[in-house]
Amino acid sequence: QKNKKTTLLPLHENISRDLLDLNAIEYRITSTKVENTENVIFHNKLIPNDYVRIALALPYDGYDIIITIKTFRTGGTDKLLLRYLKGIQQSQPELRIVLLVLEGHHGDWDYLLPDSVDLIYLKNYCYQTYSQQLYNQILERLIVQHHIKILWNFNCRETYIFTEQCADFIRENIEVWGLIFAHWLRPNNLQEFGMAHENLPFVIQDYTKIISDNQTFINYLCN
């Protein structure tokens, strides 16, 4: 028997890890309808919410930075990211970082990440069919739940779209936006180029800081 589709509910920002644990169980035996849904993660009693598995996989309640990247393999972009992460580890070892990878389940360079970085492959935790809406909801909840104030997009198209579709949310919750758009990579089309460059300042015009080049962003973190 196929599980019914899950409807995502707004997540209260003060939800406890104990409640996340409770909602992580795979099956429930009760059919009681819940009326007070403020802290309920999912409607259907058969399916746990994808977000719950991700949140419980992170060992800390609070993080400083979330980095989003499409893939994490062994290419030039991945090498650049590793260098930045190692530099941050050396200069600001107390910063806690979530590296969120959209595609794949593991990578050959996973073991090279500094201790300050917790790695999440989205596909290892998402049982639902992937959609931009689902990604937006997961990213919003991670930011609120873990009190993240720095969003660093490392050449990830889905995060460009997130900044456009959830502009009000990120103005309210994110203090620093960092964009890495590797100069040797070309966007797939003009729309992506616009999201990466031309439209970005309009999306984040109310941010505390607007940082769109690599060196300035690193200098900000180090100071």
Model region roles, listed by residue range:
Residues K70, N124, N155-C156, G178-W184:
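Histidine-centered beta-alpha loop that forms part of the nucleotide-sugar donor binding/catalytic region
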Residues Q1-D64, Y111:
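Non-catalytic membrane-proximal stalk/linker segments that position and tether the catalytic domains
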Residues K4-D21, R73-T74, Q92-Y130:
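N-terminal strand-loop element at the rim of the active site
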Residues Q191-I210:
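Membrane-proximal helix-turn-helix segments that form the acceptor-binding/catalytic region
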Residues I66, A167-L185:
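Active-site proximal beta-strand in glycosyltransferases
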Residues R17-R28, Q205-N223:
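A short, active-site helix/loop in glycosyltransferases that binds the activated sugar's phosphate group
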Residues I69-L82:
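A short, glycine/small-residue-rich beta-strand->loop->alpha-helix junction that serves as a flexible
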Residues E140-Y160:
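Short N-terminal targeting/anchoring amphipathic segment
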